[in-house]
Amino acid sequence: MNTLIKIRDLSVHYDSHRVLHDVDLDIYADDFLGVIGPNGGGKTSLVKAILGAVPHSGTIEFSPSLYDGTRRLIGYMPQQSNFDRAFPISVRETVVSGLQALRRMSGRYSREDYAAADRLLEQTGLQSIARAPIGEISGGQMQRTLLCRALIAEPRLLILDEPANFVDNRFEGELYELLKQLNERIAIVMVSHDLGTITSVVKNIVCVNGHVHRHESNVITAEQLDNYNCPLQIIAHGHVPHTVLEPHK
C-alpha cells in the first residue's frame, strides 16, 4: 500500500492537558477515512497536528508523493465556525483564495485560476451566487464554498472537518457522491459526529478519544464503541437503521 502519512507516538497538549496520547496511524493513498469520537476527544486536534497547526510531540512523516516541489498537496475544509463570514469577500474570491500559497510571489490570480474556481462553483451548484458576499449566503452554501476552496489547488489528500454541517438533505447526498468520485483519485479524511451517515460513505473508521484506533472496515459495533469509550449516537437517515447507543458511564 502507498502510505501518504505515517504518524508515530503523536501526543498533543494544551497547557497541562494532554488531548492525544501516543498515537500511531497510517493514512494510505486510497483511503476514505471517517474520523469519529466524542466532543473533546481529539478529532480536530489530530487534524490540526497533521496540518502543522498545533505543537505536538512524536513524528508525522509525509510521503514524497504528497509534494509538488516544496508544496504539500493537502486540501483542508475547516469547520464553518472557524471562518470569518464578516470579511468582505465574494464566494468566487473565497474559492480562488485556496491558491493563495501558490500565488504569493505574483500576488494575483490568473484567468485560469478563476476558470478553475468557476468549474468548481458550477459542479457544486453555486455559480448563481459566485459574486455574492459570503456574509449574505446560507450556511449550506458556505460549506460548499469552503469545499471548493479546499479542492481548487488539486490536493492528493483532502481533509474535511464536519463537511455536512448546515447542508440541506438534497446537497448532502450530492456532497457524499462527489466525495466518493474524488476518492477514486485522492485520499480523504473526514471528521464527523454523525455515525449513521458516515458509515454508509467511508471505507474505514478511525475512533478518536485521547487514543486513536483505526478499523479496517466502515462497520462499528456498540461493543467496539464501548471498548474505546466512544459514546456516540447513530441517527436514522432514510433507509439507515435506527440504533441508539447509550452514553457510557
Where are the model-predicted features located?
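Conserved ABC transporter NBD signature motif
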Residues: P55-I74
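The feature captures the beta-strand-to-loop junction immediately N-terminal to the Walker
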Residues: I36-P38
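Conserved structural motif at the start of ABC-family nucleotide-binding domains
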Residues: I5, V19-D22
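Catalytic Walker B motif of ABC-type/P-loop ATPase nucleotide-binding domains
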Residues: L158-E162
